């Protein structure tokens, strides 16, 4: 089966020794070069950029409004598919005999990661709007990411939560692998944070509540995300946000401990930077870092040099700005504990005074 042809392909390169991601300095006001797209490019009615493949470079997108379609137009999950056969079939959807890139009209580029790009696409025959993550097989093999890719697909397709992006399946051709996912109209939280600056308590508390809700669900299924950051959070209508990018996620029963150092440097926990074993509580630490960044515009331990960042993380060297409210400071400091056992549990995050005080002012009432 074609799915296994990718997984079992003979390796021609060793895995890189470091699996962390270095973020550029996140001083948002003074670093306009960090904006991935200009405001004009973010306009859904702006010109659609060139598609992924050379043969589709002149592919027209006749209805520009498809970039603004409501999430109700997005289908229920399309199950895993190869380019030759649909493996799982959803009776509520058209009975696809196959999926390939030719089945989609490609729109604007939504984002770019180390190993792939994400595009807005429309399924030709149904009009469904999705996001399509495109990865080069050559890159997957070069960096020995076959197992990681398969794990990402398996984890994302197993999750069903309003604050987690849905996976509709995947397919592949000779050169590339394509992940078909839920499309969220307002894009990355990082871009919103970069464009408008730090969030107020009302908006930040709403977002932290939703991420805590998603992580609590994942942890109950013994899944650790391991890469929480604004770039991996998408925003839909009515300030509904969804955690995405499960490339570093892993299934980890409570009795197990991990030692792989991965994720983004500014968000690493003390046990990671000190090469100690860790568990799901690293996500709680990252949630504290996220809360700090949403309220200030930059993560708490950010430095130009990686080693200096590591030292500040291990020493819990947190410089708390005076303009952060006392309730918000309390939440952040209870999440950013050196000892994982001392970190606030995600269920308690949702009942914290900072959350409860701001909840009546959220745009939509959360459950």
Swiss-Prot record:
Catalyses which reaction(s): L-seryl-[protein] + ATP = O-phospho-L-seryl-[protein] + ADP + H(+); L-threonyl-[protein] + ATP = O-phospho-L-threonyl-[protein] + ADP + H(+)
Active site: 227 (proton acceptor)
Gene Ontology MF terms: ATP binding; protein kinase activity; protein serine kinase activity; protein serine/threonine kinase activity
Pfam families on file: Pkinase
Entries under SUPFAM superfamilies matching the protein: Protein kinase-like (PK-like)
Residues annotated to bind ATP: 110-118, 133
Compositionally biased spans, kind Polar residues: 1-29, 37-48
Cellular component GO terms held in the UniProt record: chromosome passenger complex; cytoplasm; kinetochore; kinetochore microtubule; microtubule; nucleus; spindle; spindle microtubule
Localization terms from the record: Nucleus; Cytoplasm, Cytoskeleton, Spindle; Chromosome, Centromere, Kinetochore
Residues modified as Phosphothreonine: 260
Highest taxon above the source species: Eukaryota
EC top class named in words: transferase
EC number: 2.7.11.1
Modification sites for Phosphoserine: 5, 76
UniProt similarity note: Belongs to the protein kinase superfamily. Ser/Thr protein kinase family. Aurora subfamily.
Function (record text): Component of the chromosomal passenger complex (CPC), a complex that acts as a key regulator of chromosome segregation and cytokinesis. Has a role in error-correction of aberrent kinetochore-microtubule attachments to ensure that sister kinetochores become bioriented and connect to opposite poles by promoting spindle assembly checkpoint signaling. Acts in opposition to the phosphatase PP1. Not required for kinetochore detachment from microtubules during replication of centromeric DNA. Phosphorylates histone H3 to form H3S10ph during mitosis and meiosis.
Subunit-structure text: Component of the CPC complex at least composed of IPL1, BIR1 and SLI15.
Miscellaneous comment: Present with 149 molecules/cell in log phase SD medium.
Protein name from the UniProt record: Aurora kinase
Organism: Saccharomyces cerevisiae (strain ATCC 204508 / S288c) (Baker's yeast)
């Amino acid at each position: 089966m074609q799915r296994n042809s990718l997984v079992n392909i003979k390796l021609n390169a060793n895995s890189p020794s470091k699996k962390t991601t270095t973020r550029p300095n996140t001083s948002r006001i003074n670093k306009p070069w960090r904006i991935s797209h200009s405001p004009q490019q973010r306009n859904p009615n702006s010109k659609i950029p060139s598609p992924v493949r050379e043969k589709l470079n002149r592919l027209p997108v006749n209805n520009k409004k498809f970039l603004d379609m409501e999430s109700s137009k997005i289908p229920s999950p399309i199950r895993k598919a190869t380019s030759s056969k649909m493996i799982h079939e959803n009776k509520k959807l058209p009975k696809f005999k196959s999926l390939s890139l030719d089945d989609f009209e490609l729109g604007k580029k939504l984002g770019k990661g180390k190993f792939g790009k994400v595009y807005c696409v429309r399924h030709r025959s149904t009009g469904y709007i999705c996001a399509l993550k495109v990865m080069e097989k050559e890159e997957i093999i070069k960096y020995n990411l076959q197992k990681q890719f398969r794990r990402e697909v398996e984890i994302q397709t197993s999750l069903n939560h309003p604050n987690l992006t849905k996976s509709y399946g995947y397919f592949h051709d000779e050169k590339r692998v394509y992940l078909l996912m839920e499309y969220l109209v307002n894009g990355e939280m990082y871009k919103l944070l970069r464009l408008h600056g730090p969030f107020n308590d009302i908006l930040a508390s709403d977002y932290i509540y939703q991420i805590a809700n998603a992580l609590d669900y994942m942890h109950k299924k013994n899944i650790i995300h391991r890469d929480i950051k604004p770039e991996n959070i998408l925003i839909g209508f009515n300030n509904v946000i969804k955690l995405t990018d499960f490339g570093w996620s892993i299934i980890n029963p409570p009795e197990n401990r991990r030692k792989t150092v991965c994720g983004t440097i500014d968000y690493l926990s003390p046990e990671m930077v000190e090469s100690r074993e860790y568990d799901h509580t690293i996500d709680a630490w990252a949630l504290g870092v996220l809360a700090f960044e949403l309220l200030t515009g930059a993560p708490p331990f950010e430095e130009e040099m990686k080693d200096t960042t590591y030292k500040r993380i291990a020493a819990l060297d947190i410089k708390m700005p005076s303009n952060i409210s006392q309730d918000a400071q309390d939440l952040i400091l209870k999440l950013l504990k050196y000892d994982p056992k001392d970190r606030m549990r995600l269920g308690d995050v949702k009942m914290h005074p900072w959350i409860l005080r701001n909840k009546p002012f959220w745009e939509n009432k959360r459950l």
